[in-house]
Amino acid sequence: HKVILSRDGRAWNISKGISVEDFVEGIEWEDCRAAMGDGAVLISCPDSADSLVCVAENGRSVRLPLDKVVTAYPGSQIVRTDETCIIDACCCSESDELLYISRKGKAMRVAVSRYTLRKDWGCGLVDGMNIIYEGDMLCRCLVYQPERSLTVISQQGKLLALLTDREATKKISVTKGVTVQGVDLMRLSGTDVVVDALYAEQGVIMLTNNGKARGYAVDDITRVNRNSSGITGIAGQVVRAVEATITVNQEEK
């Protein structure tokens, strides 16, 4: 199933039995659709997950019990955002580690178990990544996967494929505290910022604000250590990236 989390901390559980038609046309999903139009986060929940970690632009986060989120009344205020807003969230388990990434190219790795599981409904944001640079803010939160290559995309179209942390000489070490500033993940120039990061199995498609798109096979991108600048992937202002599946034409083999 999936969870939709609005920028102001309201949540909706989308069970497997809800069809696309039900969601698009159902009056009961009107507020949820409006929240998605305003930048809500769509989170996939694996069966092994027991927690939902909600992350705000200012780097603060909170860990909530997933079973309570799933059974909550649709649109319930599960977290109080105060003067910030939710930018990302992920479903995870007690044994997982999380990777926080900021727009200035900083990254922080932390164990989920270091965060207290908050059972009080509508609680505020607490621990997280310490945002120290002016104009910086958190942009992504992922379940850390050291055996996979992380692809990082910048607003000005730079594409960076990192060595897996099993291979890299500059590893993303786990933090000992619950609020630190992070390490350098991607080297940026001028006003460029990170807009997305993902673990892609086969390919990545970069999307710009004027409707252009360009795809890359992950295996065709040279993998490097963190704190590198990456290659030019596409011209224009990138707004996000999505994972792509590559199919091979049997007649061309």
Task: Describe the function of each predicted region.
Residues 1-253:
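Short, structured "edge-of-domain" segments at secondary-structure transitions
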